[in-house]
């Protein structure tokens, strides 16, 4: 765990910003998420079309420490409808830098951006097994509104389809009273 002195210095040095095309490989975290390469490229393409917003926590020496993606619209309108509801996904902070406030600040930044865009609701799914993330979301004002089967698929970096079964809780937060 990063000690308190390093933590304060780290927080003063990070930048919260939108993803640039040059960040795409860095989102793979030295190969840990290489299997999401095509998803990252598609998310970036969607961001260029104004359909998504991709955020990172960037440190000048350490690189990308966290990421959070937002779909502004989706075929699943209970998640994102392009007008009132936006869907947060792909939210992660590197393990050594968790519990330092980076995730909370990144989530707040994304929510503030959604309010500026006129969205009233933020929606996300959290794995039923990820209790730490659920606690973060609850502290941030999200509440469980439904279960979600968590079935989705992706093509890995080799074009091989992977089916994921990750039961989740759908959580929502009202951004505009």
What are these regions (language model features)?
Residues 17, 125-127:
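Surface-exposed loop and edge beta-strand positions of immunoglobulin-like domains
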Residues 120, 127-131, 139-146, 150-177:
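C-terminal "cap" of GNAT-fold acetyltransferases
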Residues 90, 94-108, 115-117, 128-135, ...:
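Conserved glycine-rich acetyl-CoA-binding loop
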Residues 52, 119-121:
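Short secondary-structure junction motifs
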């Amino acid at each position: 765990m990063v000690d308190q002195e390093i933590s304060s210095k780290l927080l003063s040095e990070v930048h919260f910003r939108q993803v640039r095309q040059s960040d795409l490989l860095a989102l793979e975290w030295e190969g840990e998420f290489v299997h999401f390469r095509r998803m990252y490229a598609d998310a970036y393409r969607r961001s260029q079309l104004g359909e998504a917003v991709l955020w990172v926590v960037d440190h000048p020496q350490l690189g990308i420490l966290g990421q959070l993606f937002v779909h502004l619209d989706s075929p699943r309108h209970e998640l994102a409808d392009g007008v009132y509801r936006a869907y947060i996904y792909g939210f992660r902070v590197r393990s050594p830098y968790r519990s330092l406030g980076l995730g909370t600040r990144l989530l707040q930044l994304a929510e503030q951006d959604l309010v500026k865009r006129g969205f009233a609701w933020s929606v996300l799914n959290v794995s039923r097994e990820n209790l730490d993330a659920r606690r973060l979301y609850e502290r941030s004002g999200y509440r469980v509104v439904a279960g979600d089967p968590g079935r989705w698929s992706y093509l890995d970096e080799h074009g091989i389809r992977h089916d994921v079964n990750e039961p989740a809780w759908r959580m929502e937060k009202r951004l505009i009273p």
